[in-house]
Amino acid sequence: MGITDRKIRQKEEVRASILDSAWEMVITEGWPALSIRKIADAIEYSVPVIYSHFENKDAILLEFNRKGFRLLINKLKDAKAGKQSPQEEIFAMGHAYWSFAFLNREYYQLMFGLGIPTCEAARRIPEMNDFNAAVTASIKALIPPGKVPAVDPFLKFQSFWSMMHGLVSINMLNKAAAGEISAAAGHPGISGQPGQGAGTIPANGLVPGQPRQTPESKTMHGASGHNGLAELVLNDVICSFIKGIVS
């Protein structure tokens, strides 16, 4: 290995150690605790070394932001793969979005500004467009040909995102209250039977009377910490969105 190659490899290793240390700090202490000085102390390098790899803390946050969106996009694509209709794709993506949020809280908080301000550059990353495209493609396929009045797919994407983010935020930021409500409600399933999960979605967007439990619903139960009511609301939100387009 030549000198140039060795320097490149060493630079990549230092950059990776900076990100690894930053992520460990976020996991143990939260995003507000992250600082260039603390990262430098953790990896035993000087502050100028950190700045030689990242212009500022926002540059580090941007790196995590992009990675988070790549993870989310892959989850959404996996969820919609092999589905028989756009209704099923949207339903599956809604559950995948929820699951991602609670299994990757730190990423989600950063990506969507939950408890931490997002930098302006994060709003212009190409991964945002990929996220938009993954959902909008299914929305376009869902819109009946010649529907009057015309449906704007981008507007519907914004509506879907707003509904999903709002539901996640309520449950993530007010977990204790949500748990109390769920307990008081007796943890009802979709059909009023405890433990019943998400079912398949017919053309009219309504939840069928005899739902079956799916991997998505099981993941949601374990990730959120309060099932039943949260699942009922999640399914209602997604199905109402679908019905609003197809009817």
Predicted regions and their residues:
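Residues at secondary-structure transition points
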Residues: 5-13, 55, 59, 63, ...
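Helix-turn-helix
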Residues: 17, 21, 25-59, 63
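Hydrophobic alpha-helical connector segments
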Residues: 63, 77-106, 147-150, 156-160
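N-terminal intrinsically disordered/low-complexity leader segments
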Residues: 1-13, 184-221
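Amphipathic alpha-helical packing segments from all-alpha helical-bundle domains
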Residues: 119-145, 154-159, 228-240
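Amphipathic alpha-helical linker/stalk segments
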Residues: 66-90, 109-112, 126-147
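Amphipathic alpha-helical segments used for helix-helix packing
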Residues: 102-120, 169-180
